[in-house]
Swiss-Prot record:
The lineage of its organism: Bacteria, Bacillati, Cyanobacteriota, Cyanophyceae, Acaryochloridales. NDH-1 shuttles electrons from an unknown electron donor, via FMN and iron-sulfur (Fe-S) centers, to quinones in the respiratory and/or the photosynthetic chain. The immediate electron acceptor for the enzyme in this species is believed to be plastoquinone. Couples the redox reaction to proton translocation, and thus conserves the redox energy in a proton gradient. Cyanobacterial NDH-1 also plays a role in inorganic carbon-concentration. Its EC number is 7.1.1.-. It is an enzyme of class 7 (translocase). NDH-1 can be composed of about 15 different subunits; different subcomplexes with different compositions have been identified which probably have different functions. This is NAD(P)H-quinone oxidoreductase subunit N. The gene is ndhN. Keywords: Membrane, NAD, NADP, Plastoquinone, Quinone, Thylakoid, Translocase, Transport. Belongs to the complex I NdhN subunit family. It is found in: Cellular thylakoid membrane. Its main location: membrane. It catalyses: a plastoquinone + NADH + (n+1) H(+)(in) = a plastoquinol + NAD(+) + n H(+)(out); a plastoquinone + NADPH + (n+1) H(+)(in) = a plastoquinol + NADP(+) + n H(+)(out). GO terms for cellular component: plasma membrane-derived thylakoid membrane. It comes from Acaryochloris marina (strain MBIC 11017).
């Protein structure tokens, strides 16, 4: 039985623009197929929740401090974490095409944060970003730069 949607246009759009905003049906299932096709193309994929990351620039490319919640009499501490994207790009397998960062619940991101995600892919060609921006009746996507320009 042949596949109805091969995902070649989706992969081509990601490779050309670097960052893509997607709209997925609320019943789910479609995004999983496209995630699988992205992995089959040769990208290492990471799935991250967009809300709660804080400053995207420091989270993705700088060593950043994280404070765990202060619960009672514990000492107030700060843990330092390595840069999320930079660390993953340095440790990519040699056969991988690049790193595909899939951010779900991206409708909570501000226009400035979406513009940063579009810009970081221009500075790092091995990084591709997919942001889930909301719901639609069918699986739809656009380059993130077009979405930022229209907003």
């Amino acid at each position: 039985m042949p596949l109805l949607a091969t995902g070649k246009k989706f992969i081509r759009t990601i490779e050309q623009s670097g960052a893509v905003g997607i709209y997925v049906p609320s019943e789910g299932g479609f995004e999983g197929r496209y995630k699988r096709r992205l992995r089959a193309t040769g990208y290492l994929t990471l799935f991250v929740s967009a809300p709660g990351m804080g400053d995207l620039a420091s989270y993705f490319t700088d060593v950043h401090g994280v404070r765990p919640p202060h619960l009672g009499k514990n000492q107030i501490r700060t843990y330092f974490l390595p840069p999320f994207v930079t660390y993953q790009l340095e440790n990519l397998p040699p056969q991988a095409k690049g790193l595909a960062l899939w951010l779900y619940d991206g409708k909570r991101l501000a226009k400035q944060e979406l513009a940063y995600l579009s810009a970081i892919t221009a500075s790092e060609p091995r990084l591709k970003v997919v942001v889930e921006l909301g719901g639609a009746r069918s699986f739809e996507w656009q380059p993130l730069s077009d979405i930022v320009a229209a907003a």
